[in-house]
């Protein structure tokens, strides 16, 4: 059984030769080169992923939704009762939440995973629970480093097992009342931004309570002193079990050489952690949508990513990742199904007849 260090060491580099071949193929399709814009770049990115065997393709699709509660809820940083985490997790098993509807439309299976819900176990939910909620980051660490490492390893293995069973496209999501607070803390740490720049309203927090949320994030960072150069340290000190879980999906997908669609602000914070832990992960991440949460722009700038969709969404759950899955499939369809210029005897300006 491989250790976490060994798994991370084995993340493959993109296949640049396959990417070059893909670009050459795309340039010869029935269109002016570059005219399908970022769809072309996405197809080339996919071609470079070793788990896809050198060609853009989508097999089975899976949405992994990490569910957990947060001790920082006690600081008044969320309007929803904590029990809503458990209620919504149960609703996910019935297919009635936003991510479930959008994932069904995209043909993706939703895996609802309990990594720290503060309630009795829920039928139909995958049990990877570390504890009933993490610690209150405003007074101490969210969890121990050991807890974070064990959960990362478990999620990586779960993700790789799905890959072995035919999943070639992953999406990440989360569920947890008050979880935008630790996400903002992580973004603040990784980007060097003040809490005021990255703290937003989350699930409709009244403007009158934003200053308290900013103060909570600042206190969490001051008390825990997370090391911005150590992704696991940041996750364990000011993160949460759901954020660790999403990071694990990204690491696991990359280990298998497969793409993973990010969701919104919560996933950006996890992506920052994943890229700090293993920079090679970056090549396997696909940004789905531009979250309406305040700190989104700063997080995305630090990741050097431009999402494909601008929908003013901030639901979370993985809803944006599910919505973007057809875009990935469209890039594959373009690559495989379009005709070629040469077959139609079309010579574009600046090219030579062969």
UniProtKB/Swiss-Prot annotation:
Classification via CDD domains: DMB-PRT_CobT
Signal peptide: none
Keywords recorded for this protein, A-Z: Cobalamin biosynthesis, Glycosyltransferase, Transferase
Pfam families according to UniProt: DBI_PRT (PF02277)
Database matches in InterPro entries: Nict_dMeBzImd_PRibTrfase, Nict_dMeBzImd_PRibTrfase_bact, Nict_dMeBzImd_PRibTrfase_N, Nict_dMeBzImd_PRibTrfase_sf
Pathway: Nucleoside biosynthesis; alpha-ribazole biosynthesis; alpha-ribazole from 5,6-dimethylbenzimidazole: step 1/2
Catalytic activity from the UniProt record: 5,6-dimethylbenzimidazole + nicotinate beta-D-ribonucleotide = alpha-ribazole 5'-phosphate + nicotinate + H(+)
EC number of this enzyme: 2.4.2.21
Keyword Transferase set for record: yes
Origin superkingdom: Bacteria
GO molecular function: nicotinate-nucleotide-dimethylbenzimidazole phosphoribosyltransferase activity
Example GO BP: cobalamin biosynthetic process
Function: Catalyzes the synthesis of alpha-ribazole-5'-phosphate from nicotinate mononucleotide (NAMN) and 5,6-dimethylbenzimidazole (DMB).
Family: Belongs to the CobT family.
Subunit structure: Homodimer.
PANTHER family registered for this protein in UniProt: NICOTINATE-NUCLEOTIDE--DIMETHYLBENZIMIDAZOLE PHOSPHORIBOSYLTRANSFERASE (PTHR43463:SF1)
HAMAP family: CobT (MF_00230)
Protein name: Nicotinate-nucleotide--dimethylbenzimidazole phosphoribosyltransferase
Gene responsible for this protein: cobT
């Amino acid at each position: 059984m491989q250790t976490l260090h060994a798994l991370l060491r084995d993340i493959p580099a993109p296949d640049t030769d396959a990417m070059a071949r893909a670009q050459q193929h795309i340039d010869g399709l029935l269109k002016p080169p570059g005219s399908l814009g970022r769809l072309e770049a996405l197809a080339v990115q996919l071609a470079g992923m070793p788990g896809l065997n050198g060609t853009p393709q989508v097999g089975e699709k899976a949405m992994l939704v990490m569910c957990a509660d947060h001790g920082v809820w006690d600081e008044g940083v969320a309007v929803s009762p904590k029990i809503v985490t458990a209620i919504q997790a149960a609703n996910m098993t019935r297919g009635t939440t936003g991510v479930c509807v959008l994932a069904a439309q995209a043909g993706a299976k939703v895996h609802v995973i309990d990594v720290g819900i503060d309630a009795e176990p829920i039928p139909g939910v995958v049990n990877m629970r570390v504890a009933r909620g993490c610690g209150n980051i405003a007074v101490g660490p969210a969890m121990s480093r050991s807890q974070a490492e064990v959960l990362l390893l478990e999620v990586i293995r779960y993700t790789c097992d799905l890959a072995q069973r035919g999943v070639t496209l992953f999406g990440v999501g989360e569920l947890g009342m008050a979880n935008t607070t630790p996400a903002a803390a992580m973004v603040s740490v990784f980007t060097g931004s003040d809490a005021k720049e990255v703290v937003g309203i989350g699930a409709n927090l009244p403007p009158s309570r934003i200053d308290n949320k900013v103060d909570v994030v600042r206190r969490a960072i001051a008390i825990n002193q997370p090391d911005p150069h150590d992704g696991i340290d940041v996750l364990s000190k000011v993160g949460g079990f759901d954020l660790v879980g999403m990071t694990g999906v990204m690491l696991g997908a990359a280990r298998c050489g497969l793409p993973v669609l990010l969701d919104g602000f919560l996933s950006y914070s996890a992506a920052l952690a994943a890229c700090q832990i293993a920079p090679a992960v970056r090549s396997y991440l696909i940004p789905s949508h531009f979250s309406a949460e305040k700190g989104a722009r700063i997080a995305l700038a630090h990741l050097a990513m431009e999402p494909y969709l601008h929908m003013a969404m901030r639901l979370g759950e993985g809803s944006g990742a599910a919505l973007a899955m057809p875009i990935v499939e469209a890039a594959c369809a373009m690559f495989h199904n379009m005709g070629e210029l040469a077959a139609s005897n079309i010579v574009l300006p600046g090219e030579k007849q062969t």
